[in-house]
Amino acid sequence: MKPAKVSLLRRLLHSLKHVDCNIAKRFPSTIKIVKLLMIFMVFTPISSIYAEDVYQNFEELKNNEDPSDYGVVTKETGSPVLVLAIHGGGIEGGTSEVARELSKEYSMYLFEGLKSAGNSVLHITSTHFDEPRALKMTGNHEYVISLHGYAEEDQQIEVGGTDRVRAADLVEKLQHAGFPAVLLNMDHPHAGVSPNNIANKSKTGLSIQIEMSTGFRKSLFGIFSLKSRAVTQNERFYEFTEVMFRFLKNSY
């Protein structure tokens, strides 16, 4: 139980003491319900109620989470392209494994959730993600390929980013290989075109953001679990990453 949550709960419950006594006497059950709702809201992750992040930046996360519950992996290859996966591990499952495969030839930054459960609390949205090593690596590369996952059981790959020409070319290559890819409009929530998005803080500001549905990510592995994904990549996984390798080699 985190001290910050305990303190918040105490303040909320204390505030109920100032409720007019007549109201409390007339509606005792209502007061009890309000107290229960307060407890629920404090101890339920904000993301599950409002689909918002628990932490607004990396400093907040670092100050509240055990260091063993997350990790950062980096690899420099001298390539102009950085493969970026800031929601790896158990946060957006499957993005770590794709990033690691592509890192055989390209630089990589990977932030991973390593909890046995509840990794969604480690999600910091791209426009707020400011882990120092991520900022440094992004700023040292010309281009960024940003890997993400979103909750949808249908198989879909949504491609966005600021590099519209290359993004459209990638969609064409993926479709030709039989993958369910679509090019997002600039105003789509998953387009990833905000200048505050860490993927757009490279030397050129050019990025491709790849959003993979849960259904598609599951199709890449024999067993879709945190511990098993790294050793159960299937033929479809390697077909997908091979398309990515060819695209990267021919485009940059």
From Swiss-Prot:
State the Gene Ontology terms under molecular function: hydrolase activity
Q: Which residue ranges traverse the bilayer?
A: 33-51
Domain of life, per lineage: Bacteria
Membrane-topology descriptor: Single-pass membrane protein
What InterPro entries does UniProt report for this protein, alphabetically? Gamma_PGA_hydro (IPR008585), Gamma_PGA_hydro_sf (IPR038128)
Q: Write down the Gene3D superfamilies for this protein, in alphabetical order.
A: Poly-gamma-glutamate hydrolase, zinc-binding motif
Coiled-coil spans are none
Q: Which Pfam families does this one have?
A: Gamma_PGA_hydro (PF05908)
Q: Which UniProt keywords apply?
A: Cell membrane, Membrane, Transmembrane, Transmembrane helix
Localization recorded for this chain is: Cell membrane
What's the family? Belongs to the UPF0714 family.
Q: By what name is this protein known?
A: UPF0714 protein YndL
* Native source organism of the sequence: Bacillus subtilis (strain 168)
